[in-house]
Structures are given as structure tokens and as C-alpha cells.
Amino acid sequence: GPLSPLLANIYLNEYDWEMARRGVPVIRYADDIVVLAKSKRAAERLLETTRRYLEGKLKLKMNVGKSKVVSVFAIRNFKFLGFALGKGKNGIYIRAHTKSLKKAKAKLKELTSRSQGRNVRVVMQKVKVYIRGWLGYFGIASMKTTMREWDKWLRRRYRSYIWKQWKKPKTRAKSLMQLGIPEWQARAVSNCRKAYWHMAKNGHVQRAISKERLARAGYYSILDRYESVHLCD
């Protein structure tokens, strides 16, 4: 629960001071700890020192399965607090870990589910709240290309959502015509029986439910938000 990180900080404060006294750089959030060392031998020694201190002095059980020595230069990346940290051709990088991205996209998919039957503006507001919170944490990560792809994906999700809500061919044709699609094209598209997701990519549907119209309806661009909070590149 919310109290657990606070209790961990209080209880492990003694460990922080001990490592600081020894001149050992430590990054810690609650009970997730990264201990930095200059060599593999030093890292292995510090891992054992940490285990003895936590288990002997503080009477805590260290998860041996999750505790290991890694080099940010020798491996592709390592995961910490939902981030993937490593070194690439352009130097050290911080990215959202694959698992974090997968979890976030699953949540967005859930929030934009066509089965909920809510007004699309209500759905957009819920998505906006989630995006702001998620990027408030992960906005430091380098992932502009991913955010651009998600932006397109979300707009398509909304188009398929709206297309389903229009339900009947007559309603779809009328709505398309009101949004500027010629009658003969609107009627042809409205009678198409292809899946909602497929129809969301139809040129006439995209023109009717354009990026600008979605924005006026309350669409919150995940790419724009990312660019406004990401200050590291």
C-alpha cells in the first residue's frame, strides 16, 4: 500500500547512512536499491556487504534471485523502477522498459474499449488524466518515436470508438455528410461491413473524424504532452 514506501524509507535510512559513511554511491527508492561500483570485484564485494548488513543488522531478507552484479556497459540494459538504463552508440540512455510500455498501452486500450458505451468526450478525459500521470513519471525517458506511434494509434482507437457508436448505416451516412463527406461516398462507406478497427483507417472516415476535429472534441495528444515534459535530449 501507500504506506510501504514510507516505512521502507524510515527503516532503510540507517543503511543509507552506513553506505554514505563508507563513501559508496547508492540509488534507492523504497526497497529497490542500486549500489554503484567501479569494478566487478568491488561490486561483488558490495553485494555481499549489503546482504550481510540487511540480513544481519536490520533483520531483512534480501531477494537473492533479484540481486545481481551487472555492468551497464556490458549488457544491453538493466531495469530499475520501470526504466531501462544502458549504454548505446550515443552514450548512456534512459528509456521506459518494455514491460512498462506494454503495461501502459494495455491500460490505454482498456480505457478506450469500445464495449463501455460512454460518450467519447468522457473517454478522452479519462485517457488525459492517465497520460498526464504516466508521463509525469516516465517523461524523462527517451521514447519520442514510440509516443508518435501511440498518438496515431490512439486517434485510430477513437475513430473506431466513434464509428461503433454511430451504429446504424443511416446514422453513419448522416454523420459523415455532416462532417463534409459527399453523399454518395458517405452512403457507400456507411454500408461497409468491415471491422471497426479497419474502418477507422478508411480515408473518408479519417477525413471526417480528422485530427483537428478530435482535438476540438478533447483529444489529448500523448506526443505533445511528452514533448512538453521531456527535457533531456
PLM-predicted stretches and their roles:
Residues 1-233:
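Non-catalytic terminal/accessory segments
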